[in-house]
UniProtKB/Swiss-Prot annotation:
Broad class of the protein's primary localization: cytoplasm
Cellular localisation: Cytoplasm, Cytoskeleton, Microtubule organizing center, Centrosome; Cytoplasm, Cytoskeleton, Microtubule organizing center, Centrosome, Centriole
GO biological process, one term: de novo centriole assembly involved in multi-ciliated epithelial cell differentiation
Tree of life domain: Eukaryota
Originating species: Mus musculus (Mouse)
Disulfide bridge partners, by residue number: none
Residue spans of biased composition, Polar residues class: 1576-1595, 1603-1614
Segments forming a coiled coil: 228-481, 552-651, 692-776, 835-868, 950-1075, 1205-1315
Modification N6-acetyllysine occurs at: K1714
Stretches that traverse the bilayer: none
Chain positions with Phosphothreonine modification: T1277
UniProt-annotated stretches for the region Disordered: 1-127, 571-592, 1416-1479, 1543-1562, 1574-1614, 1677-1736
Recorded name of the encoding gene: Cep152
The name this protein goes by in its record: Centrosomal protein of 152 kDa
Length: 1736
């Protein structure tokens, strides 16, 4: 049997199906995903799209009754028979299969492929769709005991090529044809999708019946059945082979993945090796650099060695010459010793010396005698001094005793004074003192008492009369019945606190009445004071009680009143209830109407009348009670006032009495004080005179003593002079010793130099030896490094070779694997091939593993080889660091040792020790002298005492006396000599030590001075070097920053240029589009005319003239015309065909249904109306063309809007970045300036300190030199014995030294005072400046506060208008006058500064402004842009936008102003921030009215200012240069009136707050010019530092609110203002995108507000300049924001016209009804106004 069984079916299938490339690419991507998946995912059994029943087949026994046979038959019918189209669609098949595909029996989409010689078949659609999911009708199947479930795997393109197999071609292929005709599949997809188990059983029964019919019909054809069974067996065999191949493929895939994984590992290792290689190369390069450095060092050392050798040779030559000279000198010395002339000179010298010594001895003896005499005189004077001292001490003691006595006296007197004062105070406090005081007062005031008593009597009588009147009133009130009945009887009311305080006791009212009767009876009698007081007290008590009673009554009345009120309220409530009941009864009566009407009305009326009467009665009672209460209140108030007056008078009397008592006491006290003072002063004067006499005596005595002491001091000075002479002699001896010491030092220095030379030679020898050893070691290291490098290179070569071999092996294995797979696909008979391939693959794998092992070993070896030098290098580095640390420690220690003597503490300790040593030496010398003298005296005394008892004869005594005298004389001579010798020794030793110390101190000072100078110089040099380095670094950084900024500016200019180019291209594209549209319109008209019958040639010329572009020609016209005609012809042919077909259809319909009338179906949309003529066709074509053109225009506009929006977003971002960069630049500049200032200040400070220190050191050096010269002069002076006038010259030398010292000290003191004074003056100046600043600030704050208060008061007056009802004009005039006064007051503060600065700025800006205006006008005239067009410009916060090219050409370039001008302008900005802002005049009308606008901006505002609208109104801004170097881009703002409404309000009526900033007078023009007409960099810097949203704050005043002139007018609208400058419209990307959606609103606005045809809607706006916005502004706003205003777009304007015509009927006159209120803002320097200035 042939194996090519089902190739025909496969070929037909391949021919019918078209191979899709996209599906093939998807399969490739899936294959890559599957190869990347792990093994666990691939081994899943349910992951393949194969059918489980692909392995199921018959067992080979047809007649055996087994249950699996039935199922196998069902499987044959199900799988061999073709599946319906609906089922395939349900399973995810998307392609309609042809009838030929359904008729092939052998086509199984999910099973294996063909293994015949037909080759690879393309993959099916089901495999692509069902790669990762099973079909919905899938059920696993097991074909009996012998057959197991097949393993489901994912499909890949290599395997899918095998999985499409069917019946091969053969001789029995024709016998299978009847199966195609008989067995058609069941096509109901819903049955198979949602089939229940019963339905499945029914279907299986049906298939069994069909199978039995088929078998019964073909029992004769048993050979064919056998053939089918054989084919099934073959299919099973093929399936098994396929399974084995699939398993092998899986193995191969796993191997491939494993190999790919290993490949990745190897690649990572390769990368690691490459990194290590790079590191090793870097190390090698570092080593080379170190070698080069070492070589350079070695060369330098060799050069030094050669220099040393040359110096050695020179030194050896010098030594030889010096040795020769020494030998010659020795010979000369020997010859001189032998010469006679020298001997004679020696003898002569010795004789002179002997004579000089004799003379010196004689002089010394004479001097010693003189000294003895002076010593004796000194001793006498010392004894006299001791006596005088004792006398002085006695006198001091006497004086102290006198002082003590005086102090005791003073203390006693003070004590007695204090006692007397205490006694006086006690007496005054006691009663006797009071009696004395009363007597004195009676004596002194005897005459005044009578007058006072009379006056008091008169006052009391007046008061009594008043009280009588009051009592009569009170009695009349009691009679009337206000008081209770028992008031005449005994009232047992307790006294109040006020009565107790006044001292009033209880008194019966009867007694008071009796008293009153007695008073009435005897009015002529004069009562005494006590009686009067008692009467008054009783009256007061009675009044107080009556007052309390009255109060009680008032409280009772108040309670009664409250009760009455409560009753009244209750009555009112009842009345209200009655009224409510009346209303209720009325309602009930209305409902019932008839029942109980008459009776209820009568009853209610009676009740109401009764209640009314009661209410009237109660009201009368209430009024009476209120009147009574008011009367009682008035009476009570009068009584209270009277009581208050009484109490006040009593208090006043009390105070007067106390004041009198105090006066008398003070007078007495002062009199006593005066007496005591007089007595004490007299005593003090006497004692003072006595003490003065005593002190004068003591002073005379002391003066005499002082004269004596002065004489003694003169003698002592003479002695001191002699001592100084001796000192000079000792100094001469010291000089000699010093010279000897210097010679010894020189010898020592020579020996030291010789030692140093020897040491140098030894060190040089050692250095040469170490050099040799180091050279040898370096050569060895170099050789080792070369060997290591060679090894590394060989290793690298080996690694590369191994990589190449491994790669080649991999490629070979992959190629062999591919070949094996291809052989398997084509040849099914060769089964042994996979085994061979697997062996080859195993061998390749083994080879790879071996190569890997070798590579790993090599890598380990290389790593170990690399580690060793790294470890050595680390050890060397650690040693170097340790050495550096040790050297640093040693250096620090040496510096510390050197700096020790420099310290102030060390010097202070040295001085203190020196002073202590000097004191100790002086004390020791004095102690020795005193000991020697005391010993001598004691010996003499002991000898005398010993001699006294031995009474001898007179001769012997005389002889003894003489002998003793001689001995005494000798001893006296010897003792001073010994003393002198000891003193001289001590002095010599002290002088020596002192001189040594002086020399040491001088040397130390010189060394310290040198070190200090060197350190100071080093420090200064270091500081200067650091400063230079910092300056260089800062300079480099600044250069880099400037370069980056320059690059940024270049990039920005490039971007702007690209934007301009894009805009130009867009403009050209628009022109082309417009030209094409015009051409098409004219051509369409021409074609219509041609079809109409008359065509004109003049239209071509008109079209040529209308088109602006040059590229349109006659040929182009002809081509376009031909194309249009062709298209029309085609359309006509198509339309005629369609019309003919429709007519035929209609005829058929008419013939079939005659009853249906065509008239009823005229409105039907499905039936097309026949076109009778060609004119209807043309109309339809023209309408279609118009629609198409409108759609294309809309699309183009949308696309351009999107592009522009994106570009504007990018532009905004770039401009923000530019602004940030400029801010950073300015900050950097400020920082640099600050650094430069600080640097200069630091350098100046250092220089000043250095100069001060140098001056101080120079002064100290001069002082030290002067001292040294004085000492040398002292040392150089010859001894006293040689010159006779030495004694005379010693005095002036000492005086000169003293004078010089005094002069130096005086100069130092003067300098110190000068410095202190300068410092004090500087500090005082600083304090004064601070005080002045504080005062100025305080004054400013006070003035600002005053102005604020005045401003608030003015505002209040303006708002209140003082309650006067005046007219509107008067109010406005008064407000204007108040504001003018405020402005004058406020303007006085900064008027002078502003005038000066404005004048300077005006001079600097006038000429460039004129040139810029001229150039701007010329360019604008050339470019043909209309200057009279008013524009609306909105300043948005934080958004700057570039201008188009045309605008940039119009605006002239400007140069950056200097820094001083910028500062001036910044200060002006701060001083003149708020500007006057006024709203529209009140005669602004809309609708039929007119909008009269004073052209303030046109007249007053310079062309450098542009009206820019913020959220609150218009502001003035400066035109800015777009292409100037270093200038910021112009604030590119859009018309807020167009786009603001789309963001905030979408309602047709939007209330606007309009403001319009104007300049009040032409006098303010220079200020604005000075402020605004600077360079763009200045304005940009100012704008960036201040708020960027210029004029974006809303004004707080909302009175001037009125509806705007358009239905879509925004909330913050503006009014047009003309200016001769050229302005442009633009907006941000966000608003453009929002406005593209809300185009209707701004179309309405543009049609009503800015369109030239706005007169149709009864809208008239009159101003000094024309307010006609062109059509292009609207088009530029609708998505072409960057374009200029010179290119109109007819489509947008036509659309707007149509929209306006639709919406103009809404009536704009109804929208503009209220006029806008005129608002006047305060003047500039006031900041609390609430108005926003345009310059903020």
């Amino acid at each position: 049997m042939s194996l090519e069984f089902g190739s025909v079916a496969l070929q037909t299938q391949n021919e019918d199906e078209e191979f899709d490339k996209e599906d093939f690419e998807r399969e490739k991507e899936l294959q890559q995903l599957l190869t990347d998946l792990p093994h666990d995912m691939l081994d899943d059994e349910l992951s393949s799209p194969e059918r489980h029943d692909s392995d199921c087949s018959m067992d080979g026994r047809a007649a055996e009754p087994h249950p699996s046979e039935h199922l196998e038959r069902k499987w044959i019918e199900r799988d061999i028979l073709p599946k319906p189209h609906s089922m395939n669609c349900g399973n995810g098949w998307e392609e309609n299969r042809s009838k030929t595909e359904d008729q092939h029996l052998g086509y199984h989409p999910g099973e294996g492929g063909d293994e015949g010689g037909s080759g690879y078949s393309p993959p099916g659609k089901r495999e692509q769709a069902d790669l990762y999911r099973l079909p919905e009708d899938f059920r696993p199947y097991t074909g009996g005991s012998k057959q197991a479930a097949s393993v489901i795997t994912f499909s890949d393109p290599q395997r899918d090529n095998f999985q499409q197999f069917g019946l091969s071609r053969g001789p029995s292929c024709g016998a299978l044809e009847p199966y195609k005709a008989v067995y058609k599949p069941y096509r109901n997809s819903s049955v198979q999708k949602n089939s229940s188990p019963a339905q499945e059983v029914a279907a299986s029964d049906m298939f069994e019946g069909l199978q039995q019919q088929f078998l019964g019909a073909n029992e004769t054809d048993s050979a064919e059945n056998i053939h089918i069974i054989q084919l099934q067996v073959l299919n099973k065999a093929k399936e098994r082979q396929l399974d084995s191949l699939v398993e092998k493929l899986k193995d191969s895939e796993r191997q491939v993945r494993y190999l790919s994984h290993q490949l990745l590992i190897v690649q990572d290792e390769k990368d690691g090796l490459a990194l290590s290689l790079r590191e090793s190369q870097q190390l090698f390069q570092n080593g080379k650099e170190r070698e080069m450095q070492l070589e350079a060092q070695i060369a330098a050392l060799e050069a030094q060695v050669e220099a040393f050798r040359v110096s050695e040779e020179k030194l050896t030559k010098k030594l030889r010459t010096t040795e020769i000279t020494l030998e010659s000198l020795k010979q000369q010395l020997v010859e001189l010793h032998h010469s006679e002339s020298l001997q004679r000179a020696r003898e002569h010298h010795e004789s002179i010396v002997a004579s000089l010594t004799q003379k010196h001895e004689e002089q010394v003896s004479s001097l010693q005698k003189n000294l003895d005499a002076t010593i004796t005189a000194l001793q006498e004077q010392e004894s006299i001094c001791t006596r005088l001292k004792d006398h002085v001490q006695q006198l001091e003691r006497n004086q102290e005793a006198v002082r003590l006595e005086k102090t005791e006296l003073i203390n006693r007197l003070t004590r007695s004074l204090e006692d007397s004062q205490k006694q006086c105070a006690h007496l005054l406090q006691s009663g006797s003192v009071q009696e004395v005081a009363q007597l004195q007062l009676q004596l002194q005031q005897a005459q005044k008492a009578h007058v006072l008593s009379e006056s008091m009597n008169k006052a009391l009588q007046e008061e009594l009369t008043e009280l009588k009147d009051e009592i009569s009133l009170y009695e009349s009130a009691a009679e009337l019945g206000v008081l209770p009945g028992d008031s005449e009887g005994d009232l047992s009311i307790e006294l109040t606190e006020s009565c107790v305080d006044l001292g009033i006791k209880k008194v019966n009212w009867k007694q008071s009445k009796a008293n009153r009767v007695t008073q009435q009876e005897s009015p002529d009698e004069d009562p005494s004071k006590d009686e009067l007081i008692l009467k008054l007290k009783t009256q007061v008590q009675r009044l107080l009680t009556s007052n309390s009673v009255k109060r009680h009554l008032v409280s009772q009345l108040q309670s009664d009143l409250r009760e009455c009120r409560e009753t009244m309220e209750a009555f009112q409530q009842s009345k209200d209830g009655d009224s409510g009941m009346e209303t209720k009864t009325d309602t009930s009566e209305k409902t019932t109407k008839q029942l109980w009407l008459e009776s209820s009305e009568a009853i209610n009326r009676e009740d109401i009348l009764q209640l009314k009467n009661e209410v009237q009665v109660l009201q009368k009672q209430n009024q009476e009670l209120k009147e009574a209460e008011e009367k009682l209140r008035s009476t009570n108030q009068d009584l209270c006032n009277q009581m208050r007056q009484m109490v006040q008078e009593f208090d006043h009397d009390k105070q007067e009495a106390v004041a009198r008592c105090e006066r008398t006491y003070q007078q007495h006290h002062e009199a006593m004080k005066a007496q005591i003072r007089e007595s004490l002063l007299a005593k003090h004067a006497v004692e003072k005179q006595h003490l003065l006499e005593v002190y004068e005596g003591t002073q005379s005595q002391l003066r005499s003593d002082l004269d004596k002491m002065n004489k003694e001091m003169a003698a002592v000075q003479e002695c001191y002079l002699e001592v100084c002479r001796e000192k000079d002699g000792l100094e001469s001896t010291l000089r000699k010793t010093m010279e000897k010491a210097q010679e010894q030092k020189r010898q020592l220095l020579e020996a030291r130099e010789e030692y140093v030379r020897k040491l140098k030679l030894e060190l040089e020898e050692k250095y040469q030896e170490t050099l040799k050893t180091e050279r040898q070691s370096w050569l060895q290291e170099q050789a080792a490094g070369a060997t290591q490098q060679a090894e590394k290179e060989s290793r690298q070569k080996l690694i590369q070779q191994l990589e190449k071999e491994w790669q080649s092996k991999l490629d070979d294995s992959l190629a062999a694997w591919r070949k094996t797979t291809s052989d398997r696909g084509s040849q099914t008979e060769q089964v042994a091939c996979p085994a061979a391939v697997s062996k080859a693959e195993a061998a390749a794998v083994l080879a790879e593993e071996q190569a890997r092992q070798v590579q790993q070993e090599k890598e380990l070896a290389t790593k170990e080889a690399l580690r060793k030098p790294e470890v050595e290098l680390e050890l060397k580095y650690c040693e170097i660091i340790a050495q550096k640390v040790e050297t640093a420690v040693q250096n620090a220690r040496s510096r510390w040792i050197q700096e020790l003597p420099m310290l102030a503490e060390y010097k202070a300790l040295l001085r203190a020790q020196q002073q202590e040593w000097a004191k100790q030496q002086e004390l020791a010398v004095a102690h020795r002298l005193s000991l020697a003298l005391s010993e001598a005296k004691e010996k003499w005394k002991s000898e005398l005492e010993n001699m006294k008892p031995n009474v001898m004869s007179v001769k012997e005594l005389e002889e003894k006396v003489h002998s003793l005298q001689k001995e005494l004389e000798l001893k006296d001579e010897e003792v001073p000599v010994i003393v002198r010798a000891e003193v001289a020794k001590a002095r010599t030793e002290w002088n020596k030590e002192k001189q040594e110390e002086i020399h040491k101190i001088q040397e130390q000072n010189e060394e310290d001075y040198r070190q200090f100078l060197e350190d100071h110089r080093n420090k200064i040099n270091e500081v200067l070097a650091a400063a230079k380095e910092d300056f260089v670094k800062q300079k480099a950084e600044l250069l880099l920053q400037k370069e980056t900024e320059f690059q940024a500016c270049l990039d920005q200019s490039r971007k702007e240029w690209t934007l301009q180019e894009a805009q130009q291209t867009q403009v050209e594209i628009r022109q082309y589009e417009e030209d094409t549209l015009t051409v098409l319109a004219y051509l369409l008209k021409d074609t219509q005319l041609e079809y109409g019958g008359d065509s004109q040639d003049k239209q071509l010329l008109e079209a040529m003239s209308a088109c602006s572009s040059k590229w349109i020609s006659v040929q182009y016209f002809e081509k376009v015309k031909a194309c249009i005609q062709k298209a029309l012809h085609d359309m006509l042919s198509l339309l005629t065909d369609s019309v003919a077909s429709e007519q035929e259809k209609r005829k058929v319909v008419k013939s079939s249904a005659d009853t249906v009338s065509w008239t009823s179906s005229e409105g039907d949309s499905a039936v097309p109306v026949p076109l009778p003529d060609s004119t209807s066709v043309r109309c339809a074509q023209s309408s279609a063309w118009l629609k198409a053109e409108a759609e294309t225009d809309k699309k183009i506009c949308e696309i351009k809007g999107l592009r522009c929006g994106h570009c504007f977003q990018e532009l905004e971002k770039e401009k923000q970045e530019c602004q940030d960069l400029r801010r950073k630049l300015e900050k950097c500049r400020r920082h640099l300036q600050h650094l430069e200032r600080t640097h200069r200040a630091a350098v100046e400070k250092l220089g000043e300190e250095n100069s001060r220190v140098v001056e101080e050191l120079i002064e100290e050096n001069h002082d030290m030199k002067n001292k040294l010269e004085a000492l040398r002069a002292l040392c150089r002076t010859p001894p006293r014995s040689l010159s006779a006038g030495a004694a005379e010259s010693a005095g002036p030398s000492c005086s000169r030294q003293a004078l010089e010292e005094l002069r130096g000290q005086y100069i130092k003191a003067v300098r110190k005072i000068k410095r202190d004074m300068l410092r004090y003056i500087q500090e005082s100046k600083e304090r004064a400046a601070e005080m002045v600043k504080a005062e100025v600030l305080r004054e400013r704050q006070e003035t600002a506060r005053k102005m604020r208060n005045y401003y608030l008061s003015c505002l209040q007056q303006i708002l209140q208008d003082n309650g006067k009802e005046e007219g509107a004009e008067k109010k406005i005039m008064s407000a204007a006058s108040k504001l003018a006064t405020m402005a004058e007051l406020l303007g006085t503060i900064a008027e002078s500064d502003c005038r000066v600065r404005c004048a300077q700025a005006g001079r600097s800006v006038a000429l460039p402004l004129a040139s810029e205006m001229l150039t701007g006008t010329e360019r604008s005239e050339r470019s043909g842009v209309n200057h009279n067009i008013p524009h609306y410009v909105e300043s948005k916060p934080n958004s700057g936008k570039t201008l188009p090219r045309s605008v940039c050409e119009q605006l002239p370039g400007r140069k950056a102003a200097p820094r001083s001008q910028r500062r001036l302008e910044e200060s002006k900005h701060r001083e003149m921030r708020p500007m006057a802002s006024t709203a529209l005049p009140s005669d602004c009308r809309c609708g039929d009215a007119s909008c009269r606008h004073s052209g303030v901006l046109a007249k007053d505002v310079a062309p450098e200012f542009v009206p820019c609208q913020g959220e609150g109104g218009f502001d003035l801004h400066e035109k800015r240069d777009a292409l100037g170097a270093g200038s910021e881009p112009l604030l590119y703002s859009a018309a807020h009136s167009f786009l603001g409404g789309a963001e905030k309000n979408s309602s047709p009526r939007c209330i606007s707050e309009s403001r319009h900033t104007t300049l009040r007078s032409p006098s303010e023009m220079p200020r604005l010019k000075a402020l605004m007409c600077g360079s763009p960099t200045e304005t940009d810097s100012i704008a960036s530092e201040k708020s960027q949203g210029v004029g974006s704050q809303d004004s707080p005043v909302k009175d001037g609110v009125g509806p705007s002139s358009s239905p879509a007018w925004p909330s913050d609208s503006t009014l047009p203002c003309g200016s001769p400058a050229v302005l442009f419209l633009g907006d941000g990307s966000q608003r453009t995108q929002e406005m593209l959606g809300d185009s209707v609103q701004w179309k309405q606005f543009s049609a009503t507000s800015c369109h030239p045809d706005a007169q149709k809607s009864n809208m008239v706006c009159r101003s000094s300049h024309t307010l006609d916005l062109p059509k292009e502004t609207l088009h530029s706003q609708q998505g072409k924001m960057g374009a200029t205003l010179g290119h109109p777009s007819p489509q947008s304007t036509d659309m707007l016209k149509t929209d306006f015509k639709r919406l103009s009927g809404t009536g704009p006159s109804s929208l503009c009804q209220k006029p806008l209120i005129k608002l006047t803002a305060p003047m500039p320097s006031q900041q609390d106004s609430g108005f926003d200035s345009p310059l903020e």
